[in-house]
From Swiss-Prot:
Gene3D superfamilies: Cytochrome P450 (1.10.630.10). The keyword Transmembrane helix applies. It comes from Oryza sativa subsp. japonica. Heme binds at residue 468. It is found in: Membrane. The lineage of its organism: Eukaryota, Viridiplantae, Streptophyta, Embryophyta, Tracheophyta. The gene is CYP99A2. It is a multi-pass membrane protein. One of its GO terms (biological process) is defense response. This is Cytochrome P450 99A2. Its main location: membrane. InterPro entries: Cyt_P450, Cyt_P450_CS, Cyt_P450_E_grp-I, Cyt_P450_sf. The keyword Transmembrane applies.
Length: 532
């Protein structure tokens, strides 16, 4: 007890005489300093907290994100466009999702898409740089991936004025006529003989369509068809590029870990494919340099040699533009034609109606006149539109990059955010379409929706500044191919198959392809003899 009493006495003495305790004086000084610092920094902290809180309030809603991987697990349940539609049904048409290390806003409504693609399109007119665009697309020198700016505007002008104008597309009519007739002859030759059970031999359309569209694009680009070897080399390289161009490569989602793409061999695969492209394009360019002409490559070569542009424009730039032309002209058109035939085989009543229209218009007409009669095929045009609604070649439009912090649908989108437009979801939404999952071409009878983006729930080629510059070239070719397939052949399924047996499974790369190639039996139309 005496010990505790003694200690208490000492404490009381120290308390009553603080000046005799240096430690107490230091604590007083420290407390004063902390108080002063707190008073000075409190406004700054409050401002930062308020700003952060405000930013959180205005950021688009979205699902939970895990450390490191963000919300990527949400995309594993299905194809990206399907998974994103399911998430949007819960979180809304403007949704935030962190894909790995990439902040992404997903747009799934026409109103929000209009903001991105028309009302504020300058703010979203650029593209993110992807692994594929850097290696396969010649370091973003192509029209599709070039950053928004003066160089891209120059490329866009070249495409719309010199390379893919309405006048140029019209001048290529003889090429389309010849090669689509060659397609007809090749289908007849491939179907000759008998399949199992004594029936006709089924034809795999995909390869024949790809050969046709590639040859037409080649003749448009440099005046002659590629040899078989060059064509195979190009198509092999193109398959690699398309497979990894959706922006879902590891390095595209985790930029700080891009070295992993080298460890997995992805970079080397892309460089090998780039080498194949170089080999093909070098030969094409050499041929065009030897033989002066009016082909699209010759036009580019003259522009290169004149040196009048404000930017360096060399052979690499020409290769990047050729790649865009071949990709759009070959892959998207052939895939779309195969989807049209798939839908028609699943819907026999529509097939009968559209085929009757084509034959009514084409009967007793010269093949050279067919393309000029396409505008009379109103129902066929509806069939193609409806096919592209349900099976868009680009289910997720090419990603946009936010160049300046702004709002979409009342939510803040920060500069540097990647913006993805789910055109597939909008085209299948019951909010905008009656019987949205049904194949009903008549829904386009009013003519309100076109391929240019007049209605934002229907964007097969996008719209705005970054709309596909080759859409006219592609649609003219697609319509002629479909018309001639319907005119020259009666189509049926292989023995034992019913319309409901036609699977519509797909795989998504940069474009949407059928997972399993369509096989059909082609019987020549008796009133339209095919000369082989």
């Amino acid at each position: 007890m005496q010990f505790f009493a003694k200690q208490n006495c000492q404490v009381n003495l120290l308390t009553n005489n603080p000046s005799s305790n240096p430690r107490f004086i230091m604590e007083i000084n420290s407390a004063a300093t902390l108080t002063l610092v707190s008073l000075l920094t409190l406004p700054i902290l409050l401002a930062l907290l308020t700003r952060k809180s405000s930013s959180k309030k205005r950021r688009p809603p979205g699902p939970w994100n895990l450390p490191l991987v963000g919300g990527l697990l949400h995309l594993l349940r299905s194809h990206p466009q399907v998974a994103l539609r399911e998430l949007a049904s819960k979180y809304g048409p403007v949704m935030f999702l962190r894909m790995g290390q990439i902040d992404t806003v997903v747009v799934s409504s026409p109103a929000a898409a209009q903001e991105v693609l028309r009302d504020k399109d300058v703010m979203f007119a650029s593209r993110p740089s992807l692994l594929v665009s850097e290696i396969f697309c010649y370091d973003n020198l192509d029209v599709g991936f070039a950053p928004y700016g003066a160089y891209w505007r120059m490329l866009r002008k070249l495409c719309t004025v010199e390379l893919l104008s309405t006048k140029v597309v019209r001048q290529l009519a003889p090429v389309r006529n010849d090669e689509t007739l060659t397609l007809v002859r090749n289908i007849k030759a491939a179907s000759s003989g008998h399949g199992g059970g004594g029936g006709k031999k089924p034809v795999t359309l995909a390869r024949l369509l790809t050969t046709c569209t590639n040859t037409i694009t080649a003749k448009a680009a440099f005046g002659q068809a590629c040899g078989v070897e060059l064509q195979e080399q190009f198509l092999t390289a193109l398959d690699v590029g398309l497979k990894f161009s959706g922006g879902f490569c590891f390095g595209d989602l985790f930029p700080s870990l891009r070295f992993i793409d080298a460890m997995t061999g992805l970079r080397s695969r892309l460089w090998r494919a780039r080498g194949q492209l170089d080999s093909v394009f070098d030969k094409i360019i050499a041929q065009c340099e030897e033989h002066q002409g009016d082909s699209l490559v010759n036009v580019l070569l003259r522009i290169r040699d004149q040196g009048d542009l404000e930017f360096p424009f060399g052979t690499t730039n020409i290769k990047a533009i050729i790649l865009d032309m071949f990709t759009g002209g070959t892959e998207t058109t052939s895939s779309a034609a195969e989807w049209v035939m798939s839908e028609l085989m699943r819907n026999p009543e529509v097939m009968a109606k559209v085929q009757a229209e084509v034959r009514r218009v084409f009967d007793n007409k010269s093949p050279q006149d067919h393309e000029g009669l396409i505008d009379n095929l109103r129902y066929m045009k509806m069939v193609i539109k409806e096919t592209m609604r349900l099976n868009p070649v680009l289910p997720l439009l090419m990603p946009h990059l936010c160049r300046e912090t702004c709002d979409i649908g009342g939510y803040e989108v920060v500069e540097g955010t990647r913006v993805v437009i789910n055109s597939w979801a909008m085209a299948r939404s019951p909010e905008y379409w009656d019987d949205a999952e049904e194949f009903k071409p008549e829904r386009f009878e009013d003519g309100m929706a076109d391929y240019k983006g007049s209605r934002f729930e229907y964007l097969p080629f996008g719209t705005g500044r970054r709309r596909c510059p080759g859409d006219t070239f592609g649609m003219v070719l697609l319509e002629l191919i479909v018309a001639r397939l319907l005119y020259y052949f009666d189509w049926s399924l292989p023995a034992g198959m019913q319309p409901d047996d036609v699977d519509m499974d797909f795989v998504v790369t940069a474009t949407t392809r059928r997972k399993n190639h369509l096989q059909l039996v082609a019987s020549p139309y008796k009133l339209a003899p095919i000369q082989i």
